[in-house]
């Protein structure tokens, strides 16, 4: 089963807001701040329409928390861990929905695109969902496009063969639940 769930949008928008305030973070530095703030446990719904438009993400997270009586993040690290934990919980909810609809138990989550490079999020996802997380290519869209063209041109016989070739073309990481 395939379902796209909001990914790093919220965190990227926070970074953009912080940049305008003179606080620039490279992702490894921000993930370290998040890791250091792991005791902060407030969760938000990353798929809430409030978070869809660009701009002012930290303020919108504050509003979301205030409206629901939740403890709002105070530090940039708390914002980051709040978002990452919330994403992992959103993935867990989505897995339950997919399992209910399909009648199948999902045993592995495949993370593609930019999120595949976020080891903290991937480990949180494995821990919170209680299943293995396997990363795929950062440029998943590109690989998919190449696969379709290769099948159309007769270079590969079918999708199974294309997937096997793609899997040999990148290094995957596997995250086990704690």
Language model segments and positions:
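Glycine-rich Rossmann-fold phosphate-binding loop(s) that bind the pyrophosphate
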Residues: 114
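Active-site core segments that coordinate phosphate-bearing ligands/cofactors
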Residues: 1-108, 117-141, 147-177
